[in-house]
């Protein structure tokens, strides 16, 4: 959950830590040290919302960051839905990264075809299946949005796709 935190922490014992520049530098150093083909970079969701960057720039900077950092795949989090499905679809269309979420059916919505249940990545000659799962968002996402989503329990779906990917 990066929640649009572009800048490092400003105060307290974590002052100066975090932020996109620091994250990117660390990720690049790991890719250099271990070889980029040996590093799998995933985002578990909630890259949206949380600071004025999201509010003022409409979520575009977060998409640019995910693309620039060359994530291998991202999952959706509940805050990705804060501005509605159509707006989320607009942002997802601008991602150069596979978006995965297996336990919601987006058929018939603006996200139809943009979000896959899983992706198979290849790193260091090995195929790796990445399944995206999202918690039940009914208590934290606007009811009008939730009514457009078909939710399935993550454990059931994870087991189903694990069998498919074996």
Predicted regions and their residues:
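Acidic, metal/ion-coordinating pockets
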Residues: 2-166
